[in-house]
Amino acid sequence: MSASLKNQQGFSLPEVMLAMVLMVMIVTALSGFQRTLMNSLASRNQYQQLWRHGWQQTQLRAISPPANWQVNRMQTSQAGCVSISVTLVSPGGREGEMTRLHCPNRQ
């Protein structure tokens, strides 16, 4: 064997252990970030669903609510305008409230 091959060495045990610890810390941090990101996306999706169904329920002719959703719709009329208030509760327990005023076009 040549002298240069005899002098070459691999990584020492402390270097390998340090690299493994760093890798585990990075993977753990990334998995926590991914979990947080997924939870925030799920929350955003629930909020969008709540908004969309609330908007549909405040129409003059509301469509039937999705299964497992609780809807409380109240409609009042005054001075030719119709006010529709809706309280929604999603199957996941998220609650929302919306009020919309419908007035006819006067020309």
Curated annotation (Swiss-Prot):
Propeptide: 1-10
Segments passing through the bilayer: 11-30
Residues recorded with modification N-methylphenylalanine: F11
Any one GO CC term of the record: membrane
Places the protein is found: Membrane
Pfam families given in the database record: N_methyl (PF07963), T2SSppdC (PF12528)
Cited InterPro entries: N_methyl_site, PpdC-like_C
Alphabetical keyword list: Membrane, Methylation, Transmembrane, Transmembrane helix
Keyword Transmembrane helix: yes
Membrane topology value: Single-pass membrane protein
Domain of life (superkingdom): Bacteria
Function: Not yet known.
Name listed for the protein in its UniProt record: Prepilin peptidase-dependent protein C
